[in-house]
Regions:
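Catalytic glycan-binding domains that act on GlcNAc-containing polysaccharides
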Residues: 47-204
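Conserved positions in beta-strands of structured domains
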Residues: 218, 255-257, 285, 302-305
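Extracytoplasmic
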Residues: 94-97, 102, 147-151, 204, ...
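Hydrophobic membrane-insertion alpha-helices, especially the h-region
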Residues: 18-35
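N-terminal Lys/Arg-rich, disordered targeting/topogenic segments
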Residues: 1-15
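Surface-exposed, glycine-biased beta-strand/turn segments
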Residues: 188-265, 297, 326
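Zn2+-dependent peptidoglycan hydrolase active-site motif and core
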Residues: 233-235, 250-288, 313-315
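Conserved, short, structured surface segments that act as functional micro-motifs
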Residues: 217, 267-273, 293-335
Length: 335
């Protein structure tokens, strides 16, 4: 009887352990569904709207077209010049940031082809001229392909054969997601990701500043003591000290994704600049654009204020790459 009792107890313990494992696995599935699927993003966004809170949920379209930009931002970035970059130089800056992440053989392939085009790869590591030289190389590839910046960047990171094939399948000025979909899934996945990263960083590097670059930053990017809610919280942008009614300019060309008001962000504008890059302008007193509008760099899109969860007139400026907030000061030209 004692032996049977022990066996029954062991079976009971095993059953309990299995149930616990099943419960934990179910929790893990629910977490993954909430944080890494489109339905989860939808319900998190809906909850944030109902309770007037912020959310890190990605826009639904990001799950279907922006995967090539998911590489985000490297841990360290080369310093930008204290001036607005030319389009080709900005393109070269993005490539310069992504190149070190390739393995030696891939970099050697890129450098050998650059030599064939008459470039000296040693200049790609020169802090003073690397962005300009890589920009010239990408301009050469763009001209050879008769396509877009996206096609030129695909050419750089995945090679001429892959880029030529993609060009024959899709329209000449197709963006990277369409180019990537035209290639076999196993062909150059890392190179496609780094091409997306380079395009995102080049877009961010080409942006200007929403107000004078010498306006004081009163609250930087990063963790801080929240001024209204208390406790240490992540500050996803920078707060700029500007008086009520200051004209706020779009930092680059793009399409207005949002122009509306809520109790947290106040009257806010979000501009999609392409290549996974968006800029946000919060707490305005007036909005001068509507969702769907196309804006140019320097166009006045709002006037600053203190709407939403705010303690006084200022502009909260936020920059995101691949759906993740980055420090806008990394891309400010004035130092």
């Amino acid at each position: 009887m004692e032996k049977l009792s022990l066996s029954f107890g062991a079976r009971r313990a095993l059953t309990t352990a299995r149930r616990l494992c099943d419960f934990l696995a179910a929790l893990a599935c629910l977490w993954a569904a909430a944080w890494h699927t489109p339905p989860g993003a939808f319900f998190r966004g809906l909850t944030a709207r109902i309770f007037h809170s912020r959310t890190s949920a990605r826009p639904l379209l990001a799950y279907y077209g922006g995967g090539v930009y998911a590489a985000g931002v490297p841990d360290s970035l080369p310093a930008l010049p204290t001036r607005i970059l030319s389009p080709d130089e900005a393109l070269g800056y993005g490539a310069r940031c992504a190149l070190p992440q390739l393995d030696g053989d891939e970099r050697a392939r890129i450098f050998n082809r650059a030599r064939q085009e008459g470039f000296n790869p040693a200049t790609f590591a020169d802090p003073r001229g690397a962005s300009a030289e890589l920009g010239h190389l990408l301009a050469r590839y763009r001209a050879q392909m008769g396509g877009s910046d996206d096609l030129a960047m695909l050419d750089l990171f995945c090679g001429e054969l892959a880029a030529s094939y993609a060009r024959t399948v899709v329209k000449p000025h197709a963006e990277l997601p369409a180019l990537a979909r035209s290639l076999p899934p196993s062909l150059c996945p890392k190179g496609i990701g780094l091409a997306g990263q380079a395009l995102g960083l080049s877009t961010a590097a080409s942006l200007s500043w929403p107000v004078s670059e010498h306006v004081r930053v009163v609250s930087p990017f990063g963790e801080r003591e929240h001024p209204t809610l208390g406790g240490v919280r992540m500050h996803r942008g920078v707060d700029l000290a500007v008086p009520q009614g200051t004209p706020i300019a779009a930092t680059g060309p793009g399409r207005v994704r949002r122009a509306s008001e809520d109790s947290v962000n106040g009257r806010c504008v979000i501009v999609d600049h392409g290549h996974g890059v968006t800029s946000a302008y919060l707490h305005n007193e007036a909005l001068l654009v509507d969702a769907g509008d196309t804006v140019s760099r320097g166009e006045i899109i709002s006037r600053s204020g203190s709407t939403g969860r705010s303690t006084g007139p200022h502009l909260h400026y936020q920059l995101e790459i691949a759906g993740l907030p980055v420090d806008p000061l990394l891309f400010r030209k004035a130092r």
